[in-house]
Amino acid sequence: MAGEPSSNSWFRCRRIVEFRDTDAAGIAHFSAFFFWMESAEHEFLRELGIRVVDNAPEDEESLRRELASSEGVGRELEVSWPRVSVSADYKAAVRFGDTLDVFIAVAERGTSSITYRFRFENSGNLVAIGTVVVVRCLMRHGMKPLPVKIPAGISERIMAHQLPSE
């Protein structure tokens, strides 16, 4: 079934619920899941050889040509992946000391965006699911991030982890 972590699409990493991640009741605070999604995404990208913040993007020449007329494009190019949407649904509580398997896969890819799906499991039991949408952007000092196309080389590596169609 699409969405199950047995699919080869899923990348898995582990996170231990630290004391700082819990609330007064000793249960993981809802916000901890957002940090875990971001750190899992970063681990996933590192594994694929993709920088989270890239000062020398592989498509630098085409970016410079495409953006030649844009304001604020100087000698330094910095490309990153800001979040534009995040959500989580919680199924069961996790506590200090629990070990979570965090699974990440690609649900969709647009021209400049990626939608990730996350599954959190504790001892094989589903405890939460999440979604994060990121957009590849040119980051310009003092200016709004500018969405830019995901280059083919990056797209190929990421799409190897796309979930099967439902």
Put a short name on every predicted segment.
Residues 2-8, 90-99, 106-166:
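HotDog/MaoC-like acyl-thioester-processing domains
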Residues 2-84, 138-166:
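Hot-dog-fold acyl-thioester-processing enzymes
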Residues 71, 84-90, 101-103:
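Short structured motifs
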